[in-house]
């Protein structure tokens, strides 16, 4: 609800450098949850310094996808360009009517059964399959991903106040992290800390902070919370964490390829 619209707006703005204004019409899920997801805020920021009128269309008109938006470029009050865009999740967009770009053939296998059989035949683990397909540079990338995840947890645990979005929801991560009870069981403590980490990242997302789409902004708190807890309390090394991220990426890629990572869809 933010990365996709931002990408679409930036692309459309670059294509219409002479336009003196824009209209962004949001439909479906984008319209109904736009302010809470800061969709309107990111569109205004992206189109700046030129003005943009944000329209929320709550009608039940047929749509090609629940996350549909229309962009109009104006010059002297007249329409000079128009585009309908679909935000399919994880920052990916599809322009209505265009043939989707064919992604690079990084992973030749598209089902887990195929990957499992391949790994068994070649006696490799999932992270080794990723390394084979992506190359050694994947570890530098995943290192940055892990650093960003930990930073998001740290910021979230150190911040109080009201979240953006207009619903006056208070941040809970810091309170939950410090709310230790004298008679707290080991299981309760574990649940409290994991939840606090997850809240911390999700609240950073709700405030427009820097997080990792895993695989989307809405799901951004789960992996950081579990992985950080396992590292801090169970002694998992950075290398093991990065390998876990690589394996998780395989699963996420299979879902994105064969189904959808869009909650609205």
Identify the meaning behind each predicted range.
Residues 11-15, 39-46, 228-236:
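A glycine- and small-aliphatic-rich helix-loop capping segment at beta-alpha/alpha-beta transitions
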Residues 17-22, 48-52, 66-68, 79-81, ...:
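Short coil/turn connectors at secondary-structure junctions
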Residues 4-8, 39, 219-223:
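Catalytic-loop motifs flanking and including active-site residues across diverse enzymes
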Residues 21-56, 243-265:
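A structural-propensity feature for long, helix-poor, extended segments
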Residues 2-25:
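N-terminal phosphate-binding or glycine-rich loops at protein starts, especially the Walker A/P-loop
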Residues 140, 150-264:
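Accessory "access/gating" subregions that flank catalytic or transport cores
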Residues 46-184, 192:
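C-terminal regulatory domains involved in ligand/effector binding and gene-expression control
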